[in-house]
Structures are given as C-alpha cells and as structure tokens.
C-alpha cells in the first residue's frame, strides 16, 4: 500500500504534467478556479470565526496604537536629547542599534522573569524595537537644518525655545513622519509575535493555524495583518501628504488639509475607543476571570478548550491564553506569579525539567504533587489517563528494509538516517542529549526546526527519522512506524491539570469540576482528538465541546 507521502508526491507530479499539457487559456481557467476556491475557503473561515477575528483585531489595534504612541514620544525625546548632547549621543545611538539587532523572540523571553507575560511585556519589547527609525529620523532631521536658516531665525530674535519649536522641530516633522511610517508597519508585524507570550492579537490566529496544521486560519491571520499594515501606513501618510501636519503646526494649513488631519485623528480615536469597548467582557463580568494557559500545540489547544468549556459551563469566568511560546519554561513561572491560573502539564516534564530530578529516577506522581504544593503552592488535580511520551519514528518501508523495531535497531543503522526534531528537543537532558548517551546514535545529519514543521519535512523527504509524541495525529495520517524505547529512556508523560492553590480557595467547586476529567482520556482518544483538529481541520473548541458532550459533562 502506498504511503501518504508517496501518494501526495504522485498527485503533485500528475498535476504538473497536466499543467504542462494545457494551453494558456486552460491554464488561466485553472488558475481562476483555484483562486476562487482559496477565496471561498477564506470567506468561510472569516464567517465561521467572525467574533474570534474581531477580538484579535481589536487586541492588535490596541497593542499597535499604544506601542506606536510610546515609540513616537520616547523616540522623539531620545532623538532630541542625542542632538543636543554629544556625550549622550555617543551612548544612546549605539544602544538603540544594539536593541534592534536582538532577535525579537529572545527579547520577549528575556523580560518574562522581570515583568511576566502578556501586554506589558509585548509593549516594552515593541517600544524598544520601534525606537530605531524614530530616534534616527529625529536626530538626522534636526542635524540637517541648514545653518543659514538657524542664523536667520536668531537674527529675527528667536530665543532657544522658539528656535527649537519654530525652526528645528517644525522642519524635522516630515522626516519624523517618514520614520513613523516605517515604525508603525514594523510594529504591526512585530505585534503578531507577541501572541507567543499571551499578549493576544492577530498573531494568535497565525500561530494557532501553524500549530493545528490549519493553513486557512494561518493565511487568514496573515492577510489581516498585511491589510492592517497597509491601512496603518495610509493613516500616517495623511499627516505627511503635502506636509499637512507641518503646515498645521506652522498655522498655514489649508482648510482641506485641516479637515483631512482632523478626520484622520477622529477615525483613529473612534477605532481605539471601539476596540477598548469591544474587549470589555460582553457579559459585564465584574470578577477577575481565571486564565487558562496552554503550550503551542494542537493537543494543548484541545485540552485548554476542554478545561475552559467545562469551567464556563459551571459559571466560572475564563480567559484563554493559548499557545504560549516556550511552553513550561514560560508558563510555570507565570503561574507562580499569578499571570496564569491553570494549565495542562505532563509528569515527565514536571519531574525532569521543573523539579530537576535525574533521568535515572523513575517518575513518581505522588512526589510531584507534594513538591509542587510545597515549593510552588500549586496543585495537581489528578491525571487525564493518557501518556504522551516521546518516541522516535521512521517510515514503515525503512523499518522493513533495515529490520528496525527498536531504538537500538535504529542506532545500528543511524548512519542511513537524517534526523529532525524541534529546537528544544536537542537541548533537553530528557531528550536528545540523554538519548545520545543511552543509544549512541550516529545520524547522517541533524535538522533543528519548529515543532510543527517536523512532519512536513518528513513528507518532503528532507528527513527520514524524527521525534514524535505518541498521541500525534500525523502518526496515523502518515502511517509511521513508532519504534520501541527498549532501554526505557523516556519517562512517562501523563497529562494532568496544574492549578494555583489560591484559585481553589476562591472557587472551591473548581476542584470537583476538574476531577471529573480524571482518567477520561486514553492514548487512542487523545490521538483521535488531535486527528480531528490537525487532519480533519475541525476547530479545537468544537472538538472539545463534542468530547465533553459525549462524556455527559
């Protein structure tokens, strides 16, 4: 029987052959049909998730508006200070340059221990990133004011304050606006990455689409961000057109220019107010909602929705903070700080990564529960019933070719395999580092990639061995051979609910509600739920709702 990857390759080759066999008119017709099909899927996505996209758009607008305002204020102030103070200039300009060179994800992660996750973190990073074009455009504009203009102003009796506001700053406005246009477009794009730290915004749609293999959702989120950036650039260009803002400040703007500037500002303020009002809980909840966090994967989105829907059914207000980048590394400290209230964790991750136990020790759930309560004031509320442990997988064809059943068998033939895994797999002691010591693999090549690209790389034959989670839907879709960990290297990764102890005091009924999920999901059930989201392209919320209804919860 043909593997799914081979089948897809045959379809692709057949499509290319048909395309080359067609005349130009037929090719154009096919292209039009494909475009209509894509647009149809996008329209359906927008229709089905209208409220979801409006929420994200409002969040994104507020993030960009606040960060853009702060960037403009601080950027101009720093640029002016650098212009007037040569010692400060020698320090400030290189620092602004340096901040811009730091990878954005690293900067987001850097501030998590200091100010936590969410909007505050996102605003700080966006402001630091957005300073460069504003600072340099302000500084260069002030520096380029001609000497004869300055002398003429002084000759007319301008004092230093008037010289700055009526000459330097007034002449610098067009260049500052040019810098602002660059900064705003950059902020619109950068704000999308803020979704990884729970800041919300349209990036959430992109990362959710990536994590759940939902290309339509990914494209929809990307298109809205692209449209947003075009409109944001257009907004700033109104002030720049025919030097409208400069002429307004110099009190010689035409009525048409005044009308355009004031209308532009009025529309902006209206949208800002509308976004703020939209994001106020529509059911006027006065009490602070519980924040449910998840890691960035389909399984976690589904489990997060199961928790959220179950608690909401019992009238407990919920806020979703799904797809937090870095997983446990960022969620656990945020939970301790109170930024999040509960999430799904795995016993193996808790045992090795959080509690720092050696891999040689067997995972002991009772010890995990006691230490979490004692050291972090966190409670484990039972286990769901499935073990999403690591394993390694290859194609069934390669398994048959080399007679591979176990990790040890793979080690003997590892020189014939290109191995791929997510970035953190190569760094963790309970993953690649320890695995190499236990099995002595000598792979032909190693490929680090985003966790959601492993299977695509396998399908495209860039790798032929990879790490998997035993509940992954793609194991079933691609008909992979999951190998046996014959030395028992990987610990158990039983899924359980971790919640702040204070929440149980506030909502004592939450404990009994969550305990209803104890032992309700086995490995096959979890793999099927993942399959519905990643392969059948169902919404995690719909899948979670159907699952709870089947359980009578």
UniProtKB/Swiss-Prot annotation:
Residues 57-236 form the ABC transmembrane type-1 domain. The chain crosses the membrane at residues 61-81, 98-118, 122-142, 182-202, 219-239, 261-281. One of its GO terms (biological process) is glycine betaine transport. Disruption phenotype: Disruption of the gene inhibits EGT uptake. Residues 282-553 are periplasmic. Changing residue 390 to A: Disrupts EGT binding. Its main location: membrane. It is a multi-pass membrane protein. GO terms for molecular function: transmembrane transporter activity. Part of the ABC transporter complex EgtUV involved in the uptake of ergothioneine (EGT), a natural low-molecular weight (LMW) thiol antioxidant which protects H.pylori against bleach stress. Responsible for the translocation of the substrate across the membrane. Also contains a C-terminal periplasmic solute-binding domain (SBD) which binds to ergothioneine with low-micromolar affinity. Cannot bind the structurally similar compounds glycine betaine, choline, proline, carnitine or histidine. This is Ergothioneine transport permease/ergothioneine binding protein EgtU. It comes from Helicobacter pylori (strain G27). The lineage of its organism: Bacteria, Pseudomonadati, Campylobacterota, Epsilonproteobacteria, Campylobacterales.
